[in-house]
């Protein structure tokens, strides 16, 4: 299995058993009670996902941050009190870089985070990362784009044609989640 396939497989294992309860937290209060319930905060899901990723032989670490709705971390004196959740960094040995993800998402996506967690200052909690590289910007990890092509022709008083759309990044993840919700409601 490739690096990406291992991460997606680990994410799918998590999502078969667990659901996100809509809450963001920095730590898990009672992780042993979360698994039998089948749902938990993003911290609960991320701790479980880190464990699964490590079982797959991958290096996975928490990345602490302050959610967008809670304001930016001060640059001069970042405070522990301002940290209120975390995402996951997984190290790709072949590419010598990290990819980021969050267990609260419905669809497994590398380097695409919920908008609430897309911030310009987060800190990787890994003993292997040099001090000067522990602060990371997870705001611009992936391109968020949409391309639309319209082919139209006039037929009498009507315009007929075809539209095709290509989505990248957050746009694509949101579309996939909406399509999944439509299928689940049938």
Please identify what each model-predicted range represents.
Residues 1-186:
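A sensor for short, sequence-defined functional sites
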């Amino acid at each position: 299995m490739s690096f990406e396939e291992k991460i997606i497989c680990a994410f799918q294992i998590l999502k078969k058993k667990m659901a996100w309860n809509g809450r963001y937290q920095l730590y898990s209060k009672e992780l042993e009670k979360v698994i039998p319930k089948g749902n938990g905060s993003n911290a609960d899901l991320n701790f479980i996902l880190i464990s699964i990723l490590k079982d797959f032989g991958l290096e996975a670490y928490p990345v602490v941050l302050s959610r967008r709705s809670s304001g930016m971390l001060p640059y001069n004196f970042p405070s522990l009190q301002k940290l209120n959740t975390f995402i996951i960094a997984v190290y790709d040995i072949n590419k010598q870089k990290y990819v980021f993800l969050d267990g609260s998402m419905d669809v497994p996506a590398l380097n695409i985070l919920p908008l609430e967690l897309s911030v310009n200052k987060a800190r990787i909690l890994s003993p292997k990362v040099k001090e000067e590289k522990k602060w990371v910007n997870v705001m611009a990890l992936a391109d968020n784009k949409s391309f639309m092509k319209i082919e139209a022709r006039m037929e009498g008083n009507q315009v007929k044609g075809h539209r095709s759309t290509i989505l990248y990044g957050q746009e694509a993840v949101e579309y996939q989640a909406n399509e999944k919700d439509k299928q689940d409601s049938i």
